Amino acid sequence: MLKQVVDIPASDDFAGFTITDAAGSPVEYALLSKERTQRDVFSPVNLPGVLDVDRYTLYLYAQGVLPFAAKGYRIRRAERTPALFEPLQKSEPVMENACIRVTVGEDGRVDLLDKKTERLYEDILDIEESADYGDSYMYWNNGEPFFWGRDFPAAVEVLEHNAYRQAIRITREMCVPAYYDFSQKKRAEQLAVCTVELTLSIEKGDALLHVGYT
């Protein structure tokens, strides 16, 4: 599934469009937004200039697109374009597609159900924070205790929930040693608040749980 931006010259006055692949088969898509804007054009044919365009942002349900690969699609004029997505209404922190179901508890605990095998994986994801006075080649902890995300309160927020993409953010404010004292080979007694965010997402027809963090 791809998130794409399509610019169509305003002078073409499209009421809508369809998208097909190289074989001429229709490709499913959903419209996220539409706006009239301007685009700088630099071309040996059209010369540099500014064009008024209708800009469409959409989810394209493209399958079989490999990493670092290119795949072409054709846009054709149509009588109408599908309606825009409705605003987010679902607030329950559960994500589900045909392959997996992901549940996030109020405490930030993450459980994943594999629908194919009917196996439930419980508490699958956490943040580990530890001391490290090694170098670029090795990690060295010196036996000091770890700090775990589960030991700190979690704020859970549903970011997106629709037929194409679902996303949940887990935020924790972890209180950890402010720095490492290399002269004493131990962590400082002074504490600092470290805000950690995990963003979980799934996509239509995809058996993977995508994880981002800051």
Predicted regions and their residues:
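Catalytic and substrate-binding regions of extracellular carbohydrate-active enzymes
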Residues: 1-214
